[in-house]
Amino acid sequence: VRIQRLLFKVARSPIATFFIGWVFAHMSFAIPVNRLRETERLLAFYHPQPSYPLHILIVPKKAIPSVMHVTGADAGFMVDLMQTVQSLVSELQLEARGYRLIVNGGEYQDVPQLHFHLISEHDG
């Protein structure tokens, strides 16, 4: 719990842009989260501080500050993202119950690392 609090504090600090991207790119194995999926390009895990009954984060293992920085070189990540979302929606039976896939940007983005929220009002 202490490590999670420290990480959230760092995530909102001025060094976060460099630090978060570097950690996901080089140290994702050490991030203390409840993992659901992991590929060469992404990590999906339960949000440590959920805002919804089901709240999953999907984060690239590459420093990408926001959706505005995604390029053609990130096509592999985008394919992994869609396959991961489809797999989780199926596994957690969210199709019938409803879900949303959200990406925040600009002033709505708290952490300067691209990440997607897979959420549902219904527990998984």
Question: What would you call each of these model-derived segments?
Answer:
Residues 1-124:
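HIT superfamily nucleotide-processing domains
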